[in-house]
Amino acid sequence: MSQLTFIFAAMNAGKSTLLLQAAHNYVERGMAVELYTAALDTRAGLGVIRSRLGIERGASTFNADTVFDHRILERDTACLLIDESQFLRPVQVRQLHRLAHTSQVPIRCYGLRSDFLGHPFAGSAALLTLADEFEEVRAVCGCGKKATMNARLDATGARVSAGEQTLIGGNERYIAMCPRCFYLDSAGEQDAQSTAA
């Protein structure tokens, strides 16, 4: 039976690498795979999924208007892989859940669970509600512990505790942190206090 799977982690855990490896595994066996990534993430170019290891592959893009239904699948699609799935809208997650169960094509969504303030992305919250299976990928904090939080940095490398939820960036803009380091950091303490108020 096909299902919707949410593979999540903090920044820099290797989610895109795992997606590209999964795509390779299907292709190596002679199977067709469909890849999607968020149109707003153009760090590697529009419609390109690139890992920090340097491997990349072209992909279709999704935006807020994309409809995920049977029309997006080729006749012989063996699996649908979606990168940056935190940017999906809840209605799109519902469409993907329906598609997985009516098309018999497994759908694997890779993304962040929460933003730089520790708040859920709408797409991730919907995936945590509807996905049939979950896989957490381990990221590592600078202290060596498991990182589950994301911290945003400004151009000077200082921690940011306010701003828009979505700001595309890589290692120069975000770091993964364990909860202890996230909250002990001065900006994290300010955010925790403002969230509690």
Curated annotation (Swiss-Prot):
Q: What is its EC number?
A: 2.7.1.21
Active-site residues, record numbering mapped to chain: E84 (proton acceptor)
Q: Superkingdom, according to UniProt?
A: Bacteria
Q: Where does Zn(2+) bind?
A: C141, C143, C178, C181
Name the InterPro entries for this protein.
P-loop_NTPase, Thymidine_kinase
Q: Which reactions appear under catalytic activity for this entry? A: thymidine + ATP = dTMP + ADP + H(+)
Q: What's an example GO BP annotation here?
A: DNA biosynthetic process
Molecular function GO labels: ATP binding; thymidine kinase activity; zinc ion binding
What keywords is this UniProt entry annotated with? ATP-binding, Cytoplasm, DNA synthesis, Kinase, Metal-binding, Nucleotide-binding, Plasmid, Transferase, Zinc
EC top class, as a word: transferase
Q: Which residues bind ATP?
A: A9, A10, M11, N12, A13, G14, K15, S16, D83, E84, S85, Q86
Give the location in the cell. Cytoplasm
Q: What is its main location?
A: cytoplasm
Q: Which GO terms describe its cellular component?
A: cytosol
Its subunit composition reads:
Homotetramer.
**Family that this chain belongs to:** Belongs to the thymidine kinase family.
Q: What is this protein called?
A: Thymidine kinase
